[in-house]
Amino acid sequence: HAGIRAILCLETSDRRGQKAMMRQVEENVSFWEQHRKNPFLAGMFGLHANITLSAETLSFISRSKPKEMPIHAHCGEASVDLDFCRAEGFAGPVDRFSSFGLIDGDSFLIHCVHLGEEDYRILKETGAVVVLNPESNANNRVGLPGRERLPGHILGTDGMTGDILSALRSYYLLGEGNKEPFPRMEDMMFRRPAKILSRRLPGVFGFHPGAAADIAVLDYVPLSPIRESNLLGHLLFGAKGGRAYLTAVNGRILWMKGEFPEHDILTLRREAQRSARKLANRFQSR
């Protein structure tokens, strides 16, 4: 209803039992089928992580989902994921998913902090998309990924926040000696995601006459000049916080000057607070 574009999936695992897992599989596939030609919504097949997915479940998923339906999976976030896969007889978390025919060039593999040598080989061979989440990894104390071995990676937040500029700054500051020239970071932040997303939502991405007017204007007035060579520096150290002055999707203004023109923000906040209280009460009652 808000009008944003999204690529969505439901996290599938064995944690709630077989019947729930089968419902999760059905929902993922039906959502993907329903939105195959929708310019605003697309689906993927959501997987939690190797440690919560049995061999029987992965085999069932491989048989149930359309071959061309890509997966979104947490992969090698913590060392326990790598240890589990090796104990199961695989080289690592990517190798285990791959052995069930689930990895291709459209797969989204999230984290990839703890991988084996065969995992890196499969990533290179398939061109699967690796999404790094520096703030989440730091929060969970799981270590840092080997960026130099993941040349095609893009940036994410793991749902910890909705602030991608904050994630970009953390990525830069947590580099641990990695040289991060701005052109390479611009590829990670802008060009590579646009290319990847254009395969899911064709004809949407671009900044040229005739392209869909999907635009975010930051609430940032620079004191020093902005040039192509220092744009990323302004995003890292000047416009940090990611607060938008205006957001438009397909030319429709969704947010402007701290307000939703088409929605009552007070009503939305009350609904969000009510949902948050219900969730908190569920945890506290356990």
Where would I find each of the regions flagged by the language model?
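Metal-coordinating catalytic core of metallo-dependent amide/deamination hydrolases
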Residues: A2-V113
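Glycine-enriched alpha-helix->loop->beta-strand junction motifs that scaffold or abut catalytic
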Residues: G3-R5, K65-P70, L102-G105, I122-V131, ...
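Catalytic beta/alpha-barrel core
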Residues: A49, D106-L115, V131-N137, G156
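Short acidic/histidine-rich active-site segments
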Residues: I71-A78, V131-P134, A138-V142, R147-S170, ...
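Histidine/acidic-residue-rich catalytic or RNA/ligand-binding cores of hydrolases
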Residues: S79-A91, D119-R121, R141-L150, M160-F182, ...
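C-terminal helical cap
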Residues: V129, N137-N139, G177-S229
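C-terminal cap of metal-dependent C-N hydrolases
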Residues: A212-R269
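Intein/HINT protein-splicing elements and their conserved insertion hotspots or analogous self-processing inserts
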Residues: G258-R286
